[in-house]
């Protein structure tokens, strides 16, 4: 290549900073970045507009009349799986004892005591949570029942069982956070900001959201691509607390649809019925947690809440 002068010259002629050999490329990249940024902003605006439209459905006159009953209905959904499990143990008492004693080789006395304690604990704990009485003890007892049954029955072998149990615990935490009484002190008629109850509720809601999302990891990739896309968007938004009401509605509708169409245990009379019934009520518990979040909001540890501050 022939000599083209010192650095900064082209053919011996000095160049201005705006006429360098790479200035066109730099300008192109700048325009491209601006174009990409514009597209992302447009997508964000369209998404927020669509999300707001979905959230607006909750302002319907019929929904508004039902709103006072939503927390109670949500809590009942959350604990429905515990009622179902208790009644199943009682109705299949001899089968439960035979399975744990003969197949799992637990001592007979231990099996009887375990089943009695678990059944009574689930019935009492679920009832207390629905009535919002002693919710801290009720939540602890129900979480202990989930973990102890998983250990005794050996339900840690299947990933779907484990993730679903974590999601049920997430629903319990959300129900517990909803029951926290906001005892805010006042000074000069001004409410106390960032009370301990608010922070505790925020942490519980965040933990509950993350645990509920775990179930959708196994659920998502076994469905159609359209459902996969919607579920991924919904789970990300729900986990970080961005457009949380929209995410809760979308995930709740998706899970309700598949729960009714796939876990329709009422059409079966064989052993498959028990398995489908188990999955149906566990999914109903998760739906209850999602429904409760639409009413309570995402809490302090969320993008939605931070946007209000900043």
Swiss-Prot record:
Positions on the Cytoplasmic side per record topology: 1-108, 159-209, 267-310
Subcellular localization(s) per the UniProt record: Endoplasmic reticulum membrane
Statement: the UniProt record of this protein carries the keyword Iron-sulfur: no
Spans through the membrane: 109-129, 138-158, 210-230, 246-266
Family the UniProt entry places it in: Belongs to the SURF4 family.
Function (record text): Constituent of COPII-coated endoplasmic reticulum-derived transport vesicles. Required for efficient transport of a subset of secretory proteins to the Golgi. The C-terminal di-lysine motif is required for exit from the endoplasmic reticulum. Required directly for packaging glycosylated pro-alpha-factor into COPII vesicles. Facilitates retrograde transport from the Golgi to the endoplasmic reticulum.
Protein name per the record: ER-derived vesicles protein ERV29
Organism: Saccharomyces cerevisiae (strain ATCC 204508 / S288c)
